[in-house]
């Protein structure tokens, strides 16, 4: 971890206060490669993270209900919902288990019951041509599991995937407006069923939108962020607690429909091309002044 960070010293656009801050590990995302919940010592590992006041964001694909039922308290529990129907899920995920759909349904039931104390989040990664249809079936899953929040994100193109059965191109990557349209339709379907959800926050730069249970709307303001010190305080108290016990108010710039669209106004985007033009303009101005002095 530290070796990777050190390589960034001196890179244009790096803020030194952020660079120094990165040497203090604060969050751990248990995701990306493999299935973390299938690791036999996952609870012990999460406990080790918490002892160091490192938050735990665990992502699972809802294929191991027994392991999910035994999972200890984590800061946030993600469940990847990759497709809305059995047919589509088989196409997208190419699951190893023949009873993959039954496993998924069991995990959704566990979220609503045994793991209802957790801060649970559905994660939907939208891929055009694969999983952006059938809003009603997605709503069925939400109604069954009752997650705390639903995070919808447009897929990011990482190069060609030819040869793996699902060749993706830029044509499969949705625009932000397409993601917004999907979320608005899903939200409308949820509300038509009497489910107490609404669109809470967005980060347009990441093509990401958050739908949340309205219980996170406190005194007229969304509280979808996490109060990390409070989480560890509650954890160390030994008392039982739920997702609402460690919430933090959502910044105004992150709220759905805000002018900032999720971009923190305290940050500035580093534009390499703009920086080059700026430096060139400075050099040209200096050369002009030098020429005038010589004349």
PLM region spans:
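Conserved AdoMet/S-adenosylmethionine-binding subsite of the radical SAM
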Residues: 5-189
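Auxiliary Fe-S-binding modules of radical SAM enzymes
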Residues: 112, 130-295
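Low-complexity, serine/threonine/proline-enriched polar segments
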Residues: 1-3
């Amino acid at each position: 971890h530290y070796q990777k960070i050190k390589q960034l010293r001196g890179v244009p656009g790096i803020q030194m206060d952020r660079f120094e801050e990165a040497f203090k590990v604060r969050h751990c995302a248990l995701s990306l490669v493999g299935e973390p919940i299938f690791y036999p010592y996952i609870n012990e590992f999460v406990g080790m993270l918490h002892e160091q006041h490192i938050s735990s964001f665990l992502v699972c694909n809802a294929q191991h209900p027994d392991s999910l039922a035994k999972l200890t308290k984590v800061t946030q529990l993600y469940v990847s919902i990759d497709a809305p129907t059995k047919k589509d899920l088989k196409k997208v995920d190419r699951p190893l288990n023949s009873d993959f759909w039954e496993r998924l349904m069991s995990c959704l039931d566990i979220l609503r019951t045994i793991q209802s104390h957790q801060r649970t989040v559905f994660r939907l990664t939208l891929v055009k041509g694969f999983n952006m249809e059938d809003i009603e079936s997605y709503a069925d899953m939400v109604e069954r599991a009752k997650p705390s929040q639903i995070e919808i994100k447009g897929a990011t193109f990482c190069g060609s995937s030819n040869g793996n059965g699902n060749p993706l191109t830029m044509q499969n990557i949705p625009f932000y407006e397409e993601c917004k349209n999907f979320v608005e339709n899903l939200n409308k379907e949820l509300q038509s069923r009497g489910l107490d959800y609404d669109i809470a926050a967005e980060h347009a730069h990441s093509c990401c939108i958050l739908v949340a249970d309205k219980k996170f709307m406190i005194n007229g303001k969304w509280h979808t962020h996490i109060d990390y010190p409070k989480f560890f305080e509650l954890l160390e108290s030994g008392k039982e607690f739920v997702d609402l016990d460690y919430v933090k108010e959502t910044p105004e710039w992150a709220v759905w429909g805000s002018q900032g669209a999720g971009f923190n106004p305290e940050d500035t985007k580093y534009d390499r091309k703009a920086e080059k033009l700026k430096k060139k303009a400075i050099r040209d101005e200096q050369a002009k002044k030098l020429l005038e002095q010589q004349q």
